[in-house]
Every structure is written in structure tokens, then in C-alpha cells.
């Protein structure tokens, strides 16, 4: 109910912003919107107010602070199978909308929406990572860490189209897309393990429920550990390279502000890593709390899928060029009609 009510409110914000966008430009076609803004024929005051509502609605849907209040409760309260979907599919959809709407349609307003996204990124990094380390519920911890991951991803948008440079736009958007895909894979793995454990007679909710998992199911413990290491950004995982690409994009414009943002992102990543490494410690070094652990009777397909996704975290971490090129090509195709890339 909370997700439905707040999600409806966010949709209202987004639709209200889009209606203002139409009122300011007279069109809902993104190329025409961009042309209207570039030619200064759009009504500026209405356009800026609409932009505020659009960014607020997108931030709410994404789960970026300070529009995050629904995320921990929904992740904890929903069945793990539903949480798995919420952690992946909506994030990819909202990311695609952000690319199309902000970058393709409102690129000329980049200084304005970049400032808004920078505030969202800083709030998400601070609130998400600091809150994650204090959680004892596994799904709630992953929810708070998701907020922190959203903040890291948004940092790439802060430097997109810096000084009108379309190459920096391509690199920044590709870095953010790569980051979102790497997070999605890790989230699918982590929530997939929790879902597998939860369906065997008890609900895997607390971190203590993972105690000693390595003793009776080392495969699942190993896959979960890979997911946590990737989310923490440990080298040789895709999460490390994703964070590196975002920081590299951020520092292509080495201003004092961008350097400060990079330092904040690194510090908050170290703080957030404590939450991820604590799960690994619980799985590998704590004794099982249950004298009779639930028998994990997973089919071959489930085991193969989890193993494949876990392997992707390593493969794309060691050989990231293929996935990164796909991201860059997707961005080039999106921007070709207005930037001449490719």
C-alpha cells in the first residue's frame, strides 16, 4: 500500500512536470523539445518548474535520497521474489527514461538538472551507505545500499555534456549505463540467493540467517560473496570497474567540485563496503544458528542461473571491454541524430 500510494504520487509529479514541458514547448516530441529550448522559444519559467517536477518524479521512482523513504520498507515488507523484481526492472526502466528525457530532450538545460542530480547523488551516497552499516535485516540493508549505489550512478550525469563536449557526454552516459547494468546483475544474484533460502521453510530476513552458509551450501555462499564484493567495488569484479569508470568520467573535468565529489564517493564506498563484507564474514566465519539448517533443494536450472550470473560478475570485471562497448554504442545510437557521433 505504501509503495502504491507513494508511487502514485511520484507518477503525478512526473506527469505534472511533463504537462509543464508541453506547455512550455508546445510539443512532446523530444527532438522538437530540444529544438525549442535551443532556439529559446520555450517559456523559460514554466520549463524550469516542469524540470523540477520531472527530476523529483524520476528520483522518487529511482529511490534516490531524499525521495527514498519508501524503499527500505517496501524491500523488507515485500516477498523476496517481488523484491528481486523491484531491485532490477524498475531501475533499468527509470534509467532509460532519464537518458531519453534529460539527455536527449533537455540537454540544453544540463547545467540546471546536473545541479539537481548532484544534490541527489550526495544525499544518496551519505544517507544510503551510512544507514546500510546499521541494519540487521538483510533486505533492508540491501535497500539502503541500493540508495547509495543510485548516488554513485548519478555522479556520472553530473559531468555529462561538460562544456558542451559530446565526447564527455558519451563517456559519462556509457559509464552510468555500465554501472547500472553491473548493479542489476549483483542485485539479481543477492536477492536470488535470499529468495532461494526463504522458500525452504523459513524466511531469510536477518543477517544472522546467513550464519555458516558456507558450511552446508558453499556454492551459494561463494556466489553471494561475489555479489557482495562486486557491490563493494573490490578489484576483479564488475563493480570495481563500474565505479572506476564513473570516477574517471567525473574527473575528466578536474574542478575542485568534481574532485570533492570523487573523494566523497570513494569514502562512502569504503563505508558501504563494511556492510557487504559483514555479510561475507557472517557466511564464512560465523557458526550456523540453526542446528538443523533448511535443506536447499534447488533444481539444476536455478543453480545454473545463479552460477552464470555470479560468473558474469567476474567475467565482466576481468574483461569489461565487451559490455562497455555495447553501452557506448547504445549511447552513440541514441545521440547520433543530434550529436553526429559514430
Task: Give the positions of each predicted feature.
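Alpha-helical transmembrane segments of multi-pass membrane proteins predominantly involved
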Residues: 1-342
Amino acid at each position: 500500500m505504501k509503495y502504491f500510494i507513494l508511487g502514485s504520487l511520484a507518477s503525478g509529479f512526473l506527469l505534472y512536470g511533463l504537462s509543464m514541458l508541453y506547455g512550455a514547448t508546445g510539443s512532446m516530441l523530444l527532438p522538437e523539445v530540444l529544438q525549442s529550448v535551443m532556439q529559446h522559444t520555450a517559456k523559460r519559467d514554466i520549463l524550469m518548474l516542469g524540470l523540477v517536477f520531472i527530476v523529483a518524479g524520476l528520483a522518487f521512482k529511482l529511490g534516490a535520497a531524499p525521495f527514498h523513504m519508501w524503499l527500505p520498507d517496501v524491500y523488507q515488507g515485500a516477498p523476496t521474489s517481488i523484491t528481486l523484481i523491484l531491485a532490477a526492472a524498475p531501475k533499468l526502466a527509470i534509467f532509460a527514461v532519464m537518458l531519453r528525457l534529460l539527455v536527449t530532450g533537455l540537454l540544453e538545460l544540463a547545467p540546471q538538472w546536473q545541479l539537481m542530480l548532484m544534490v541527489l547523488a550526495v544525499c544518496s551516497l551519505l544517507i544510503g551507505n551510512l544507514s546500510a552499516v546499521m541494519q540487521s535485516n538483510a533486505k533492508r540493508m540491501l535497500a539502503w545500499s541500493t540508495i547509495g549505489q543510485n548516488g554513485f550512478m548519478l555522479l556520472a550525469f553530473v559531468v555529462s555534456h561538460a562544456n558542451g563536449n559530446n565526447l564527455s557526454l558519451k563517456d559519462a552516459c556509457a559509464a552510468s549505463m555500465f554501472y547500472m547494468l553491473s548493479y542489476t546483475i549483483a542485485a539479481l544474484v543477492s536477492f536470488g540467493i535470499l529468495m532461494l533460502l526463504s522458500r525452504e521453510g523459513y524466511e531469510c530476513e536477518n543477517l544472522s540467517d546467513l550464519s555458516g552458509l558456507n558450511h552446508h551450501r558453499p556454492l551459494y555462499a561463494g556466489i553471494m560473496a561475489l555479489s557482495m564484493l562486486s557491490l563493494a567495488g573490490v578489484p576483479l569484479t564488475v563493480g570495481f570497474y563500474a565505479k572506476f569508470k564513473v570516477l574517471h568520467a567525473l574527473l575528466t573535468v578536474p574542478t575542485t567540485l568534481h574532485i570533492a565529489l570523487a573523494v566523497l564517493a570513494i569514502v562512502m564506498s569504503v563505508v558501504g563496503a563494511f556492510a557487504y563484507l559483514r555479510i561475507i564474514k557472517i557466511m564464512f566465519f560465523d557458526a550456523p544458528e540453526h542446528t538443523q539448517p533448511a535443506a536447499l533443494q534447488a533444481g539444476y536450472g536455478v543453480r545454473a542461473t545463479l552460477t552464470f550470473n555470479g560468473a558474469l560478475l567476474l567475467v565482466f570485471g576481468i574483461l569489461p571491454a565487451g559490455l562497455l562497448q555495447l553501452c557506448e554504442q547504445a549511447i552513440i545510437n541514441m545521440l547520433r541524430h543530434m550529436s553526429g557521433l559514430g
